[in-house]
């Protein structure tokens, strides 16, 4: 199982004081060195954390893959074609949200998403759609030609009871298997921590987890190398459990 380290909140800390540090590039290189299989960045329309220059700098510096999260807009499409990341994950985006609140509604935007997917694919960029674990959305993702889906784990991560968490886990598990049966590559992410990642990492249909906020939070106390190492180890151990 692969670990994508999202470095958005390195930029959040930097931007809080308008300094040049901490450096997203340095964070990406440290994460790679200590177990990250790819680097994920979300260039939001409001540029609240990652800036355009960060994306180019990280793309040019890293040795692994860059997974660029972006909204379904012409501006972001143009940016992606300039940066040429290995992967683009199309996500929903609202100006006032603190973080991504739900999955992309592929059903409601099939024609536009299909167009973006074709343009990016023709350019050699693999496309992923960040969606809820809903069979209709998964089927729609397949229908528009996206080769990858990333299942939104937020409802699982935010569950306030064991029963609710189990319900959301089963939804993710079923969705991952449905997507896998369609031939889609299945990733997952949002709200995952060292404390809740094990069940998700045990879903064999899921190939990659993208984790950011909790890793950066842990890094405040442990350092980024140890935070990445511990997360990678937790994922690896989960795969070994019966």
Curated annotation (Swiss-Prot):
Site (Transition state stabilizer): 150
Functional note: Catalyzes the complicated ring closure reaction between the two acyclic compounds 1-deoxy-D-xylulose-5-phosphate (DXP) and 3-amino-2-oxopropyl phosphate (1-amino-acetone-3-phosphate or AAP) to form pyridoxine 5'-phosphate (PNP) and inorganic phosphate.
PANTHER family for the chain: PYRIDOXINE 5'-PHOSPHATE SYNTHASE
Keywords: Cytoplasm, Pyridoxine biosynthesis, Transferase
Subunit note: Homooctamer; tetramer of dimers.
Organism: Neisseria meningitidis serogroup C / serotype 2a (strain ATCC 700532 / DSM 15464 / FAM18)
Pathway: Cofactor biosynthesis; pyridoxine 5'-phosphate biosynthesis; pyridoxine 5'-phosphate from D-erythrose 4-phosphate: step 5/5
Family of the protein in this entry: Belongs to the PNP synthase family.
Gene3D superfamilies attached to this UniProt entry: Aldolase class I
Binding residues for 3-amino-2-oxopropyl phosphate: 6, 17, 191, 212-213
Gene that produces this protein: pdxJ
Lineage, highest ranks first: Bacteria, Pseudomonadati, Pseudomonadota, Betaproteobacteria, Neisseriales
Protein name listed in UniProt: Pyridoxine 5'-phosphate synthase
One BP annotation, GO: pyridoxine biosynthetic process
Molecular function in Gene Ontology: pyridoxine 5'-phosphate synthase activity
GO cellular component terms, semicolon-separated: cytosol
Reaction catalysis annotation: 3-amino-2-oxopropyl phosphate + 1-deoxy-D-xylulose 5-phosphate = pyridoxine 5'-phosphate + phosphate + 2 H2O + H(+)
EC number annotated for this UniProt entry: 2.6.99.2
Binding site residues for 1-deoxy-D-xylulose 5-phosphate: 8-9, 44, 49, 99
Record's subcellular location: Cytoplasm
């Amino acid at each position: 199982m692969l670990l994508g380290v999202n470095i958005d909140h390195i930029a959040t800390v930097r931007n809080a004081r308008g300094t040049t540090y901490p450096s997203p590039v340095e964070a990406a290189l440290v994460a790679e060195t200590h177990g990250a299989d790819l680097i994920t960045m979300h260039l939001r329309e409001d540029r609240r954390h990652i800036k355009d220059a960060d994306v180019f700098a990280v793309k040019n510096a890293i040795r692994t893959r860059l997974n660029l999260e972006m909204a379904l807009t012409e501006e972001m499409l143009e940016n992606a074609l300039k940066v040429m990341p290995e992967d683009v994950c199309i996500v929903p985006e609202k100006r006032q949200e603190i973080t991504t609140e739900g999955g992309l509604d592929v059903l409601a935007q099939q024609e536009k998403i299909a167009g973006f997917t074709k343009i990016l694919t023709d350019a050699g960029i693999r496309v992923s759609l960040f969606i809820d674990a809903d069979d209709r959305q998964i089927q729609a993702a397949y229908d528009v030609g996206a080769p990858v889906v990333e299942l939104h784990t937020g409802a699982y991560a935010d569950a306030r009871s064991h029963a609710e968490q189990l319900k959301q886990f089963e939804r993710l598990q079923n969705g991952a298997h449905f997507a896998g049966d369609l031939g889609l590559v299945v990733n997952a992410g949002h709200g995952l921590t060292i404390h809740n990642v094990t069940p998700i990492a045990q879903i064999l249909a899921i190939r990659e987890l993208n984790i950011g906020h909790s890793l950066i939070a842990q890094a405040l106390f442990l350092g980024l190398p140890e935070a990445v190492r511990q997360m990678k180890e937790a994922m690896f151990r989960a795969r070994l459990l019966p």
